């Protein structure tokens, strides 16, 4: 055939039902049967030439069945045997050829066939050679002006691999002069080689993630190997931070592109599969820029059907891979569209006389969304949480003056003289310090140089600390600071005059400890898992566990999630562990940290420079120390001076202490007793080499306490009050984690040091309200500005990443967008933010009963422990007028974090999670106002009664820790005793009550000592009602099975209200977090040990069981550690649930404003990115259009509106009925960095 045929068909225009056509797969056998039924015109033959695995795949069959419904098209599939073994002359004839390369396909023969027969070719064959080489692909993309990650190509000669332009550093590589800092990506140049490696920086834990073609349920694996490959040619490229999701785009011609989101294989390597075992993917809408990219890719590579990978990062879209011919799997709509477009392309090319129009399927935007329900609905739009890091090892510090030339050489080598200061964190740098310490100690052994001799104990400690954890340095654990002192250390009066002290020296400060413990990881991961349940669920089964609503939102790009952390290792690891729980990830924290956690230290958002502490804070510390140095009982003046805010917890601590100096004497003698006990243990050969929690030895524990003993009391007998937080830190750690040592009087030391710390720690952030506010602003102003911008919608609708509603049948709310901003930080920021909320005049206590109750609760809270959370949630009521102040609604929640080691009765309890709002309180409904909502009104009335007649106590509900065991191993059977059912001898409470299985959707009950599991319908959990309503239901059902008399009596009598405040964050961290198969046996064997550690004497054993979970955390180097208690986390308490956005915005503006003038009106209050939530007020509204600007209503109108309208914020919600409104909303997600600059840079 010299040229492509053109078919001219006669005027016959008979209507033929395409459904009557048989599907053409093996046409040769059917020719005779079909002859009479076929139209008289010659058919256009479309030939499919590919390997059998591809041509017989489900997507190909689905599409070919549809293509063969075209009246004039016949499909012929070339058999694999013919393709491989027959010469091209014997291949079937066709008019149009669809042929593509895959493993084992003879592309040369296909090219020869096309040359011989000259058919119309759908996917250009010569370009398929280029697609197999990533270098060529990148070159074409670059020529087309398509954005690519920054990259460099390393070509190696296979015969001489060592000769290449590659210089490898500890945390970077240099390729042809181009430097790539870790994390970076290493891709083989052959596109057929899927072994792509991502290398992580040592600061995040080092190692690499190795990606490969899916094998079962894995697509990548983490490796500790940090060095790049030494053979083969590679492309090195910058790693793009995509928040853990990739987009795969499939074109059919230049004008059609279908896009799907899936979890990035680099995140944890676990392939998410649905109930049919297929990888979970979600269709997303491409923005205009991405559609242009698809158009360019399709035309540049001359591939009509073409797949490529997009990375959405930094507000841009980058192409990182072009795969050539590929179809979408499992989308009927795509199959219809693809067949229609391919058929039209063929007809237009080979039968132009039909004038086939360009028929592109309707865009998503053109499809109307039909509303399904009506009524009052509150829709969660935004969740902002500020969270303290998890349980950590005690922070330790050692200072020494060094004068040896080797230290000066190191200081000079690292450019220390530029600023006079140097911070060494990298393994290579720490190794150099260790080498110097070893060398000096060796010299000391050989001769007595008096200058070095002076520092011998400190040099030994320096060496010991740097040698901890074996040879591998993790930059997260330790750091050395060197400061240049031109005249040596300042002299103290007791020092002899010494001319040498005038010479320059270096102050070496070694900091170590303060790492997140395995218990801290468990806490963070569990809290993340519990946070999931704040988001309403979609229909269908995502992965068979609760909180799937959030996971669906996230993987479909409808969850605009950003996680920020300060630059401390423990904070970053807490954020990564939280993300792991929140997004149901598996594996190591390093890949999660690198991809999901943004460091916020660039703009001072979450970090603070201790050198720049305000003079106010210095004054406060001095006054505090002065008061606590007086050797007398506290007087009325002391109470007045120390507790002007009237804090109940402070007054309680002062009552306990009475005389601060006498209490310090007791603490000092208890520390002396402790150090002597540890020395005694070290002398005992049985326990000399005992391993304590987290690899600590008795020797290190002794050094820790000896240093405190030495530093706490000066030679003149005065106490250093600044050491009290450190003493409390250490004893709390040992009580929780080293209880097995059974050291005497630890609980007494804990009690006294806690009482002192409860005064010192909060009061260091200001004694009077004015001081607290001033110090808080110093720490928190950038964060307050950022929170304010998070609550406003400042992005442009055009850049939105949206789910494609047409393709997403199983998704309830295709246009729902939700914004979550999580800020992980240290104690200082949490104290400061809480001070701002308490003392910054957000509400008036005298006029607002709910706020007064919240302040009373906060006055009782004595410690903001690990995992403290401050949560702000923004709702929208789409039924309210756009200009109404009631359209946007803000709620404020708080949890003081992990419980301490004291009895439960000492724990403060607030009024619960989401108690009835203030407006609802004074109003008893005489009749049901709305026939549609009888249950809601009833429930509101119950809430009102509870608030008026009974204080609400939030009882913890444990979220079951998801064990990595296979499903069959996870369930405790009747004959297998679960470690969770350990009951206290006194019968004062059992673990069982606290692990009522709500989080796993299973009900647990007690029968003797056994646990049986019975499923709770998912409907009662997260799918048709808000998670909280359903938790009430499950808890009340559970009430019949729980045999814990004391707890039940103390709980509210009314089962309906049973746990309406327990909610999400009544999630004490669940124990039994082991991944070891023999846990049950271990718990049975060690039952006695588990319930009576050294820190819990017999009298408090029962309550201890409730306060803690047992964590059998596996340590990377030491196998199983000694068992350790993981403290439960206090439930979230509602501080206020009836704030308007206008009120909150003006408050935040006044705090963030540098001047004292507070603008009375904000120029615009925009709605925020939607967030799915734990509790929807009444019914959840979806798909509302949110205007870019909402002008504040004039005050007069507001009053009347408020008076006339029913508040939508009372009590727990009734069942949530998803709704689809006809109005659309377009919520956007521009880059967060831009968002921050934009909002901090301008004042509203």
From Swiss-Prot:
Residues 899-942, 961-1017, 1187-1244 are annotated as: Disordered. Residues 916-942 have a biased composition (Basic and acidic residues). Keywords: ATP-binding, Cytoplasm, Kinase, Nucleotide-binding, Phosphoprotein, Transferase. Residues 371-442 are annotated as: Polyphosphoinositide-binding domain. Its main location: cytoplasm. It is found in: Cytoplasm, Cytosol. GO terms for biological process: inositol metabolic process; inositol phosphate biosynthetic process. The modification Phosphoserine is found at residues 38, 223, 1007, 1017, 1075, 1092, 1166, 1173, 1181, 1221-1222. Residues 1211-1221 have a biased composition (Polar residues). GO terms for molecular function: 5-diphosphoinositol pentakisphosphate 1-kinase activity; ATP binding; inositol hexakisphosphate 1-kinase activity; inositol hexakisphosphate 5-kinase activity; inositol-1,3,4,5,6-pentakisphosphate kinase activity. Substrate binds at residues 53-54, 213-214, 248, 262, 326-329. InterPro entries: Acid_Pase_AS (IPR033379), His_Pase_clade-2 (IPR000560), His_Pase_VIP1 (IPR037446), His_PPase_superfam (IPR029033), VIP1_N (IPR040557). Its EC number is 2.7.4.24. SUPFAM superfamilies: Glutathione synthetase ATP-binding domain-like (SSF56059), Phosphoglycerate mutase-like (SSF53254). CDD domains: HP_HAP_like. Residues 961-970 have a biased composition (Basic residues). ATP binds at residues 134, 187, 194, 213, 237-240, 246-248, 264, 309, 321-323. It catalyses: 1D-myo-inositol hexakisphosphate + ATP = 1-diphospho-1D-myo-inositol 2,3,4,5,6-pentakisphosphate + ADP; 5-diphospho-1D-myo-inositol 1,2,3,4,6-pentakisphosphate + ATP + H(+) = 1,5-bis(diphospho)-1D-myo-inositol 2,3,4,6-tetrakisphosphate + ADP. GO terms for cellular component: cytosol. Residues 1196-1210 have a biased composition (Low complexity). Bifunctional inositol kinase that acts in concert with the IP6K kinases IP6K1, IP6K2 and IP6K3 to synthesize the diphosphate group-containing inositol pyrophosphates diphosphoinositol pentakisphosphate, PP-InsP5, and bis-diphosphoinositol tetrakisphosphate, (PP)2-InsP4. PP-InsP5 and (PP)2-InsP4, also respectively called InsP7 and InsP8, regulate a variety of cellular processes, including apoptosis, vesicle trafficking, cytoskeletal dynamics, exocytosis, insulin signaling and neutrophil activation. Belongs to the histidine acid phosphatase family. VIP1 subfamily. The C-terminal acid phosphatase-like domain binds PtdIns(3,4,5)P3 and InsP6. Despite its similarity with the phosphatase domain of histidine acid phosphatases, it has no phosphatase activity. This is Inositol hexakisphosphate and diphosphoinositol-pentakisphosphate kinase 2. It comes from Pongo abelii.
């Amino acid at each position: 055939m010299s040229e492509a045929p053109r078919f001219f068909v006669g005027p016959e225009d008979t209507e033929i039902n395409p459904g009557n056509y048989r599907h053409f797969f093996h046409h040769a056998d059917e020719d005779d049967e079909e002859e009479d039924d076929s139209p008289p015109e010659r058919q256009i033959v479309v030939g499919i030439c590919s390997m059998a695995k591809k041509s017989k795949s489900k997507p190909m069959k689905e599409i070919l069945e549809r293509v063969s419904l075209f009246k004039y098209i016949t499909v012929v599939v070339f058999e694999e045997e013919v393709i491989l073994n027959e010469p091209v002359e014997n291949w079937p004839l066709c008019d149009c050829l669809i042929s593509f390369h895959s493993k084992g396909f003879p592309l040369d023969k296909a090219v020869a066939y096309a040359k011989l027969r000259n058919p119309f070719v759908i996917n250009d064959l010569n370009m398929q050679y280029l697609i197999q080489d990533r270098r060529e692909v990148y070159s074409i993309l670059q020529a087309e002006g398509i954005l690519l990650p920054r990259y460099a190509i390393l070509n190696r000669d296979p015969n001489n691999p060592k000769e290449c332009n590659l210089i490898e550093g500890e945390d970077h590589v240099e390729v042809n002069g181009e430097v790539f800092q870790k994390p970076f990506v290493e891709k083989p140049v052959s596109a057929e080689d899927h072994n792509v490696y991502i290398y992580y920086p040592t600061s995040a834990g080092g190692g690499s993630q190795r990606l490969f073609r899916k094998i079962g349920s894995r697509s990548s694996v983490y490796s500790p190997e940090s060095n790049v490959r030494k053979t083969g040619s590679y492309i090195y490229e910058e790693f793009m931070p995509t928040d853990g999701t990739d987009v795969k785009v499939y074109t059919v011609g230049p004008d059609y592109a279908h896009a799907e989101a899936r979890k990035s294989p680099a995140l944890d390597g676990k392939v998410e599969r649905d109930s049919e075992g297929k990888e979970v993917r979600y269709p997303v809408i491409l923005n205009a820029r991405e559609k242009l990219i698809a158009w360019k890719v399709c035309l540049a590579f001359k591939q009509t059907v073409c797949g490529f990978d997009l990375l959405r990062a930094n507000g841009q879209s980058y192409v990182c891979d072009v795969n050539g011919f590929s179809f979408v799997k499992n989308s009927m709509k795509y199959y219809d569209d693809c067949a229609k477009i391919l058929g039209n392309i063929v007809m237009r090319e080979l039968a132009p006389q039909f004038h086939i129009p360009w028929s592109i399927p309707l865009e998503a935007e053109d499809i109307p969304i039909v509303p399904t329900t009506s009524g009052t609905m509150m829709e969660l739009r935004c969740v902002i949480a500020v969270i303290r890091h998890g349980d950590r090892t005690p922070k330790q510090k050692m200072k020494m003056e060094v004068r040896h030339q080797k230290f000066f050489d190191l200081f000079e080598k690292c450019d220390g003289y530029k600023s006079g200061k140097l911070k060494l964190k990298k393994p290579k740098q720490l190794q150099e310090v260790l080498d110097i310490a070893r060398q000096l100690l060796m010299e000391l052994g050989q001769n007595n140089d008096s200058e070095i001799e002076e520092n011998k104990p400190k040099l030994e400690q320096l060496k010991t600390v740097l040698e901890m954890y074996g040879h591998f340095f993790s930059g997260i654990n330790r750091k050395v600071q060197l400061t240049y002192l031109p005249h040596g250390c300042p002299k103290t009066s007791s020092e002899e005059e010494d001319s040498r002290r005038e010479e320059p020296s270096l102050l070496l400060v070694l900091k170590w400890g303060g790492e997140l413990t395995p218990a801290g990881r468990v806490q963070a991961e569990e809290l993340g898992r519990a946070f999931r349940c704040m988001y309403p669920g979609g229909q269908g089964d995502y992965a068979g566990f609760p909180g799937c609503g959030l996971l669906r939102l996230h993987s479909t790009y409808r969850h605009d999630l950003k996680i920020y952390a300060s630059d401390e290792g423990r904070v970053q690891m807490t954020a990564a562990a939280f993300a792991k729980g929140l997004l149901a990830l598996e594996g190591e924290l390093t890949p999660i940290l690198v991809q999901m956690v943004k460091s916020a230290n660039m703009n001072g958002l979450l970090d603070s420079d201790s050198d720049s502490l305000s003079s106010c804070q210095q004054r406060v510390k001095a006054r505090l120390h002065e008061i606590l140095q007086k050797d007398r009982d506290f007087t009325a003046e002391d109470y007045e001076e120390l507790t002007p805010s009237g804090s109940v917890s402070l007054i309680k601590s002062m009552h306990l202490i009475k005389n601060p100096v006498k209490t310090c004497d007791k603490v000092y003698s208890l520390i002396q007793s402790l150090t002597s006990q540890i020395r005694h243990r070290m002398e005992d050969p049985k326990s000399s080499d005992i391993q304590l929690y987290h690899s600590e030895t008795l020797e290190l524990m002794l050094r820790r306490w000896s240093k405190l003993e030495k530093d706490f009391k000066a030679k003149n007998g005065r106490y250093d009050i600044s050491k009290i937080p450190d003493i409390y830190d250490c004893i709390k750690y040992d009580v929780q984690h080293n209880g097995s040592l059974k050291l005497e009087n630890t609980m007494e030391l804990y009690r006294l040091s806690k009482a002192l710390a409860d005064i010192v720690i909060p009061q260091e952030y200001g004694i009077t309200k004015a001081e607290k506010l001033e110090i808080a602003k110093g720490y928190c102003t950038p964060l307050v500005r950022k929170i304010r911008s998070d609550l406003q919608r400042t992005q442009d609708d055009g850049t939105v990443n949206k789910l494609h509603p047409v393709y997403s049948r199983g998704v309830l709310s295709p246009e729902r967008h939700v914004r979550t901003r999580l800020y992980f930080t240290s104690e200082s920021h949490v104290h400061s933010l809480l001070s701002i909320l308490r003392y910054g005049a957000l509400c008036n206590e005298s006029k607002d009963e709910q706020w007064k109750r919240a302040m009373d609760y906060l006055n009782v809270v004595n410690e903001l422990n690990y995992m403290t959370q401050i949560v702000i949630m923004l709702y929208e009521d789409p039924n309210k007028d756009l200009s109404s102040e009631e359209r946007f609604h803000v709620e404020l929640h708080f949890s003081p974090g992990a419980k301490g080691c004291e009895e439960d009765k000492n724990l403060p309890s607030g009024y619960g999670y989401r108690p009835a709002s203030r407006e609802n309180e004074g109003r008893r409904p005489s009749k049901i106002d709305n026939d549609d909502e009888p249950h809601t009104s009833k429930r509101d009335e119950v809430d009102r009664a509870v608030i008026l007649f009974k204080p609400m106590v939030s009882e913890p509900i444990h979220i079951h820790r998801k064990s990595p065991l296979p499903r069959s191993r996870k369930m405790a059977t009747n004959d297998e005793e679960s470690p969770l059912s350990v009951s206290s001898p006194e019968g004062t409470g059992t673990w069982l009550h606290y692990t009522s299985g709500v989080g796993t959707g299973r009900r647990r009950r007690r029968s003797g000592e056994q646990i049986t599991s019975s499923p709770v319908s998912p409907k009662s959990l997260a799918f048709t009602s808000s998670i909280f309503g359903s938790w009430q239901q499950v808890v009340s059902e559970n009430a019949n099975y729980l045999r814990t008399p004391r707890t039940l009596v103390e709980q509210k009598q009314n089962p309906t209200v049973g746990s309406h405040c327990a909610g999400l964050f009544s999630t004490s961290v669940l124990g039994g977090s082991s991944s070891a198969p023999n846990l049950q046996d271990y718990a049975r064997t060690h039952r006695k040990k588990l319930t009576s550690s050294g820190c819990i004497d017999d009298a408090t054993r029962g309550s201890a069981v409730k306060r803690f979970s047992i964590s059998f955390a596996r340590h990377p180097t030491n196998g199983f550690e000694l068992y350790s208690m993981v403290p439960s986390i206090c439930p979230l308490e509602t501080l206020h649930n009836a704030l308007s956005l206008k009120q909150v915005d003006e408050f935040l503006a006044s705090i963030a404003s540098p001047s004292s003038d507070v603008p009375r009106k904000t120029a615009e209050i925009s709605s925020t990115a939607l967030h799915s939530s734990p509790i929807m007020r009444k019914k959840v509204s979806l798909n509302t259009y949110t205007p870019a600007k909402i002008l504040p209503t004039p005050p007069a109108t507001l009053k009347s509106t408020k008076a006339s309208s029913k508040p939508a914020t009372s009590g727990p919600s009734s069942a949530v009925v998803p709704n689809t409104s006809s109005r659309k909303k377009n919520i956007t997600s521009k880059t967060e960095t831009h968002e921050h600059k934009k909002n901090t840079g301008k004042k509203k």
